[in-house]
Design a protein with these regions (language model features):
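Flexible, D/E/H-enriched segments
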Residues: 2-54, 65-164, 175, 195-249
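Beta-strand elements within well-structured catalytic alpha/beta cores of enzymes
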Residues: 54-60, 178-186
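Catalytic metal-binding/acid-base residues of hydrolase active sites
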Residues: 62-64, 188-189
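Histidine- and/or cysteine-centered catalytic micro-motif in compact active-site loops
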Residues: 152-155, 185-189
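Non-transmembrane, aqueous-exposed alpha-helical and coiled segments at domain scale
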Residues: 167-175, 180
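Short conserved catalytic/interaction loops centered on acidic-Pro-aromatic/His motifs
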Residues: 180, 191-196
């Protein structure tokens, strides 16, 4: 008998993980500044519950890798996180989630079949990055969902392989006995503003080009034009998010 198709991909989304979401919770001048984004994440978590999702896969654009595609699928993730990039934004943030080693290994196996160099890891000391931790904080505060994190800051990787990894994820979900959501976590255009102008960059685009490109891609998504939107993403400076989007197409 052939493989039974059992699993369901119930939801896929491009999401933000802007670290000021955590600042938004804290007392001070930035309190409430990202409430809209927080509410949006909570809504995605609500929709996932309504759809019966048991596991969320997150493409994390802050997990930098220089060789192969990597899948963090430990049995459990817990700890206290401070961002080494932005310790003044995210400091001492606690987290506690269950992982899904079986699904992570399925993804790696399916990717290898397609010629992609992919590896699944069930390593307690391999921690999550904030591209995963920020959305899970608001979507998954009660540990309702298992979490699988996939590296998406890929420095030497080919778009064709990223596309194959996306295909492998679809194949793995079909072989998985459960219901899955997939999130591409990261901005479209993503360029930090010059340091001396950091304060003004909190609530504005760094460049007009970035604003126009983002609006163009979102328009294409709304029109259902995935081919053209992928081409736009492929030509933006921020390849990590573009690759994550390519994986989820």
């Amino acid at each position: 008998m052939g493989d039974l198709i059992m699993g369901t991909l119930a939801l896929a989304a491009k999401i933000t993980h802007v670290p000021s979401m955590y600042l938004s919770e804290l007392p001070g001048k930035n309190h409430g500044c990202r409430q809209g984004a927080i509410d949006g994440h909570k809504e995605i978590g609500k929709r996932c519950r309504e759809l019966g999702v048991d596991t969320i896969i997150v493409f994390d654009t802050h997990w930098l890798v220089n060789s192969a595609y990597h899948i963090n699928c430990a049995d459990h993730f817990s700890g206290v996180y401070t961002s080494n990039e932005l310790p003044h934004f995210i400091r001492d943030m606690t987290y506690d989630y269950d992982g899904n080693p079986a699904l992570g290994q399925l993804i790696a196996d399916e990717a290898v079949k397609l010629g992609v160099r992919a590896k699944a890891h069930n390593i307690p000391s391999l921690k999550l990055e904030y591209g995963t931790l920020v959305p899970m904080r608001y979507m998954n505060p009660d540990k309702h969902f298992k979490v699988v994190s996939i590296s998406a800051f890929c420095t030497v990787h080919d778009f064709a392989d990223s596309r194959k990894l996306g295909e492998a994820i679809v194949s793995a979900i079909k072989k998985y006995d459960g219901t899955v959501a997939v999130l591409a976590s990261g901005s479209l255009s993503h360029r930090f503003i010059d340091d001396q102008r950091a304060e003004e960059g909190m609530n504005s685009y760094t460049r007009e080009f970035d604003r126009q490109m983002d609006e163009r891609v979102v328009k294409l998504w709304r029109e259902g034009s995935s081919k053209n939107s992928a081409a736009c993403c492929r030509n933006t400076p921020t390849t990590a998010t573009a690759k994550a989007i390519c994986m989820t197409r």
